Amino acid sequence: MFKNIIIVVAVTLCALFTNEHVVYSANLEHGEQIFSANCAACHAGGNNVIMPEKTLKAEALEANNIKNISAIANQVKNGKNAMPSFSRLSDSDIEDVANYVLSKADKGW
């Protein structure tokens, strides 16, 4: 019994401290469609035509403390600075586009 507890704790700690982003069971293809229709005008290829230093590339997301699905979804839903709110999108659409963005950032766009 003690051995099982140790294994569970070890696996949990590994999962907590890994640097890999977890892309949840989102529909990345749907996220790409939402991105193309709503985000690509300013963020084509992970860039930013309004504020060039605030791209969707992994390094920029990390530097701006936007390093997980929740943070990206919050930015999409509420907007910030020059980025408008996309709260008209459904929560499912926002989650899919956030997963798509993080997936692309992890792959270098």
UniProtKB/Swiss-Prot annotation:
Q: Gene Ontology cellular component? A: chloroplast thylakoid lumen
Output one GO MF annotation.
Answer: iron ion binding
In Swiss-Prot or TrEMBL terms, this protein is called: Cytochrome c6
The record's comment on protein family reads: Belongs to the cytochrome c family. PetJ subfamily.
Q: Subunit arrangement?
A: Monomer.
Sorted alphabetically, the keyword list is: Chloroplast, Electron transport, Heme, Iron, Metal-binding, Photosynthesis, Plastid, Signal, Thylakoid, Transport
Q: Where is the signal peptide, in residue numbers?
A: 1-25
Give its localization.
Plastid, Chloroplast thylakoid lumen
GO process terms (BP): photosynthesis
Question: Gene behind this chain?
Answer: petJ
Q: Binding of heme c: at which residues? A: 39, 42-43, 83
The beginning of the lineage is: Eukaryota, Rhodophyta, Bangiophyceae, Cyanidiales, Cyanidiaceae
The UniProt function text for this chain reads: Functions as an electron carrier between membrane-bound cytochrome b6-f and photosystem I in oxygenic photosynthesis.
